[in-house]
From Swiss-Prot:
Family the entry assigns: Belongs to the CitD family.
Protein encoded by which gene: citD
O-(phosphoribosyl dephospho-coenzyme A)serine PTM positions: 14
Listed name of the protein: Citrate lyase acyl carrier protein
Functional note: Covalent carrier of the coenzyme of citrate lyase.
Superkingdom, natural source: Bacteria
HAMAP family to which the protein is assigned, alphabetical: CitD
Length: 102
């Protein structure tokens, strides 16, 4: 999926995450993470975001993630929403996304 514009999903409320995604002109994935639990869960959060991006077919993007204690399901949901908004996609393929949980 091609990232065409800047998009944001989520909030800075407790137990949430704000994901900002923008085009990166074919330079791969650049991920910046700001989290209160960086030392404990930073590697896991980064891996989860990168896995979600790969499943969506995103090969190039700049992602800024501000974590406020979000659970895995919230991190995935915010990443999916931000990618679809940034790509200009209006319809989700729910069957594909649901198959990730098999």
């Amino acid at each position: 999926m091609e990232i065409k514009q800047i998009a944001v999903a989520g909030s800075l409320e407790s137990s949430d995450m704000m994901i900002t995604i923008s085009p990166n002109d074919g330079q791969g994935i650049v991920l910046e993470l700001d989290s209160n639990v960086e030392k404990q869960f930073g590697n896991h959060i980064r891996a989860l975001i990168k896995t979600t991006l790969a499943r969506l077919g995103v090969e190039s993007a700049t992602i800024e993630a501000v974590d406020k204690g979000a659970l895995d399901c919230t991190i995935q949901a915010r990443t999916i929403a931000a990618v679809h908004r940034a790509a200009g996609v209006e319809h989700y393929n729910w069957k594909e996304i649901d198959s990730w949980n098999a």
